[in-house]
Amino acid sequence: MSDMTTIARPYAKAAFDFAVENGELAQWAEMLTFASEVVKNEAMQDILRSGFSADKLTEIIVSVCDEQLNEFGQNLLKVMAENGRLTMVPAVSDEFLFLKNEHEKTIEADVISAVVLEDSQLVAISQKLEQRLERKVKLNCSVDETLIAGVVIRAGDLVIDNSVRGKLNRLSDTLQS
């Protein structure tokens, strides 16, 4: 476990528990994702390293986020600023989304194919993954022509490489050993 995850987890867990208690999981996911993107911005990174006070940093981020953050989201950022942890917002967002997915029994799967897949193929992949993982699957699809043909699927710790490039690489490794 990385130090960032260790530091981010209590903030994410507190936000998650609050969101569940108030039936606001989707809203909190959106808020934290937006705040994460703001904090990742290069100009904002410069501001965070500038030495401003916690109050000033909170004021700046809240003004940039504008109406994307409710009062409780603003309070979370204020607490993080007071503890010098605003740079951890992306890690908190990631951890929150992990907790949300666990709670909702969902998982995101990256499907990389050599060509654009048809809807029927995506439905079949989704159904097979849902059976195998016993979770609802959200597919993130992309095309990588260097695969030559086939597909690579990544869902959590599961990696299925059924691409021609992957098969050629495995064959090459076998022949070289």
From Swiss-Prot:
GO cellular component: plasma membrane; proton-transporting ATP synthase complex
Membrane topology value: Peripheral membrane protein
PROSITE patterns: ATPASE_DELTA
Keyword Cell inner membrane listed: yes
Keyword Lipid biosynthesis assigned: no
Compartments where located: Cell inner membrane
Described function: F(1)F(0) ATP synthase produces ATP from ADP in the presence of a proton or sodium gradient. F-type ATPases consist of two structural domains, F(1) containing the extramembraneous catalytic core and F(0) containing the membrane proton channel, linked together by a central stalk and a peripheral stalk. During catalysis, ATP synthesis in the catalytic domain of F(1) is coupled via a rotary mechanism of the central stalk subunits to proton translocation.
Protein's name according to its UniProt entry: ATP synthase subunit delta 1
Organism of origin: Photobacterium profundum (strain SS9)
